[in-house]
């Protein structure tokens, strides 16, 4: 069956059986879990960022998405590094950044969205590895984009009925590979599982209903070791020698970035150059987190 726009697939049995048996517990123990905030509210899952930190000068990739503050990037932990190598072998290119998320129960979820491609290398794949309880990813085509808003709720309902939905079960030790064409034309998310335990399959109830998701990406935007300078694909300065200061908590620049993220979320197959072409130097949308 074709998944998404035809540039996506799911891979089973990513890790060898012996590694698969211990991967969830090892990850659960070794990852430094943190809370993340968006629009001053806590997102319903725990998170951690890991990536490729340059040995010579400490520079590192940065992946920006709608969160009040960008998470600190940590060195690859042992199990994540091993999984990354397996994933790279399957997709055929390097993966220098990972957003790791812990879904603590069926109630933890992520709203449907398109990944923000400001910092993602053009032509690369987005790779999501699942460990633990099986959850289902929903893919749904975006609403038809028109220059005018629908005339009525009926128009909106008709648009919604024309949208295609796919459901992709993601069992333990599987890897969902998403191409950027699918990301541009479809939204993806994981809805809360509100079913009583008796209605869930053994794979959905495994690992205490917990799931760890590792999303690997190839990132083309970089920060200096102290996060004071930014350059690369998604920044204003494209070359390291021209790196510019990061911007933190500036309302006007933050809103400009939030608006660009919104355009990518809503538009079908959006033009990267139109949305992001001038570049953004915003690192933290807000300068302070809530207490």
PLM region spans:
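Non-heme Fe(II) oxygenase metal-center motifs and adjacent flexible, charged/small-residue loops
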Residues: 1-291
């Amino acid at each position: 069956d074709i998944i998404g726009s035809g540039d996506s697939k799911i891979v089973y049995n990513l890790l060898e059986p012996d590694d698969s048996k211990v991967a969830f517990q090892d990850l659960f123990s070794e990852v430094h879990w943190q809370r993340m905030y968006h629009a001053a509210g806590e997102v319903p899952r725990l998170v951690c960022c890991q990536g490729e930190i340059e040995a010579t000068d400490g520079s590192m990739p940065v992946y920006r998405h709608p969160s009040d503050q960008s998470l600190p990037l940590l060195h690859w932990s042992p199990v994540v590094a091993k999984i990354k190598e397996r994933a790279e072998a399957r997709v055929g290119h390097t993966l220098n950044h990972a957003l790791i998320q812990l879904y603590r129960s069926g109630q933890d979820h992520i709203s449907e969205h398109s990944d923000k491609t400001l910092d993602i290398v053009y032509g690369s794949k987005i790779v999501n590895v699942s460990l633990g309880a099986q959850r289902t990813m929903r893919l749904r085509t975006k609403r038809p984009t028109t220059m005018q808003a629908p005339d009525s709720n009926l128009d909106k309902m008709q648009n919604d009925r024309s949208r295609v939905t796919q459901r992709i079960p993601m069992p333990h030790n599987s890897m969902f590979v998403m191409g950027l064409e699918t990301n541009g034309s479809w939204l993806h998310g994981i809805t809360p599982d509100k079913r009583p335990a008796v209605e869930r399959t053994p794979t959905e109830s495994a690992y205490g209903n917990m799931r760890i998701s590792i999303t690997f990406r190839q990132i083309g935007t970089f920060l200096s070791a102290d996060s004071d300078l930014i350059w690369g694909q998604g920044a204003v300065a494209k070359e390291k020698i021209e790196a510019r200061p990061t911007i933190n908590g500036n309302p006007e620049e933050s809103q400009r970035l939030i608006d660009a993220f919104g355009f990518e979320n809503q538009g079908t197959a959006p033009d990267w150059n139109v949305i992001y072409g001038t570049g953004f130097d915003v690192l933290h949308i807000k300068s302070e987190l809530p207490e």
